[in-house]
């Protein structure tokens, strides 16, 4: 009977990235996926690689920064092996902040960003809406460049007429292309796949993992990793407090293709341009169970918000809309590491950061599975933080 060194449950970007990393280390790997690889939260994601302290929980900052730095090599490797592009863009983001971005004590003294003026914004994105006072200011404005500033300095700048937004040096990637490239790479590397057959049980023999049972069959392995995202809580042997958090998204066709060049984030909506001319508008954060239906009123609101920001988008064709189910946890931080059952590991609960954290999660989990000291302390992400009995 065939067996594997490791079974990974879930073929989202986390499971795929981990399987590739394990194959690099010589392990035989089987991925068991309830549906189609990469077709749940990974496919529905926006793909903003946000590691700014303005928007990243402090305890997650080191992992987010490390993973963001890994992305060029990570994406390049997937592109080479899959012979397809993942649309990793270095365009940066324009953030129109609200008060909470400046009030969080964790970011003071850490944040490095460019405060940009109305004139800067006009030069970066000429199609952003301007009201009459903006036009007057633009006529009076003269070019001023701001160096990297601390949060305190940026806050002062924002109290002047010049400070309108922040420019953040960050990347974005196309999650659909990324997950397809990761799936192709995993197959090329010799990862085995079982799709369309949900896992119903993690099998334990003599207090040690022995494999998984699906609706159709049983697969054998001495190590199993739960990467099942929003469905992680449905697998034993330990209670895993994940829940689905719905995110709806609208997709428009820009004309011309580079109508918007940067990611644009406001307190209400974000716009994510793709190199092929698509523009993603999102996203909701909803507690709606496993319901993946989109809401017409929400799509209208997204469309109107996009037009408010960029009037020319009134002419943009609506291509599609969708919803995905992010894996949330009680503290909205991931669950990473081993458990008290030998051979059973968990890498789930990445909430809104699964795409960003895929490279570092794969590296750290591979280290844990091979009984090496991980590059970063995973104690804050241990399953045991929810209950002493659950680890």
Model-derived regions: residue spans:
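Glycine-rich FAD pyrophosphate-binding loop
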Residues: 23-44
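C-terminal catalytic lobe of FAD-dependent flavoproteins
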Residues: 175, 312-391
């Amino acid at each position: 009977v065939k067996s594997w060194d490791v079974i990974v449950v879930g073929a989202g970007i986390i499971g795929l990235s981990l399987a590739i990393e394990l194959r690099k280390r010589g392990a035989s790997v089987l991925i068991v996926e309830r549906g189609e690889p990469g077709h749940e939260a990974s496919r529905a994601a926006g793909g903003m690689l946000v590691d700014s302290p303005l928007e990243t929980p402090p305890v997650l900052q080191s992992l987010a920064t490390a993973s963001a730095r890994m992305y060029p090599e990570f994406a390049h490797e997937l592109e080479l092996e899959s012979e397809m592009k993942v649309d990793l863009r270095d365009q940066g983001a324009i953030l129109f902040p609200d008060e909470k971005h400046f009030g969080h004590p964790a970011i003071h003294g850490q944040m490095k960003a460019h405060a940009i003026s109305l004139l800067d914004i006009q030069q970066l994105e000429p199609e952003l809406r301007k009201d009459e006072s903006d036009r007057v200011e633009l006529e009076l404005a003269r070019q001023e460049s701001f160096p990297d500033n601390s949060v305190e300095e940026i806050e002062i700048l924002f109290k002047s007429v010049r400070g309108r937004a922040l420019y953040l040096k960050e990347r974005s990637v196309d999650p659909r292309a990324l997950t397809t490239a990761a799936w192709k790479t995993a197959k090329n590397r010799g990862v085995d796949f079982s799709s369309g057959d949900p896992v119903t049980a993690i099998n334990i023999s003599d207090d040690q993992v022995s494999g998984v049972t699906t609706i159709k069959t049983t697969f054998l392995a001495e190590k199993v990793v739960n990467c099942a995202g929003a469905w992680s809580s449905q697998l034993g042997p330990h209670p895993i407090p994940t829940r689905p958090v719905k995110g709806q998204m609208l997709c428009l066709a820009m004309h011309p293709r580079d109508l918007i060049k940067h990611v644009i984030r406001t307190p209400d909506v974000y716009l994510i341009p793709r190199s092929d001319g698509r523009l993603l508008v999102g996203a909701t954060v909803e507690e709606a169970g496993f319901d993946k239906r989109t809401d017409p009123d929400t799509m209208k609101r997204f469309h109107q918000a996009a037009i408010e920001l960029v009037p020319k988008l009134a002419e943009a064709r609506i291509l599609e809309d969708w919803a995905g189910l992010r894996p949330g946890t009680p503290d909205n931080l991931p669950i990473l590491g081993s458990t008290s059952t030998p051979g059973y590991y968990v890498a789930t609960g990445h909430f809104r950061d699964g795409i960003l954290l895929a490279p570092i999660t794969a590296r750290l989990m591979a280290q844990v599975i091979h009984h090496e000291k991980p590059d970063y302390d995973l104690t804050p992400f241990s399953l045991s933080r929810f209950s002493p009995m659950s680890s």
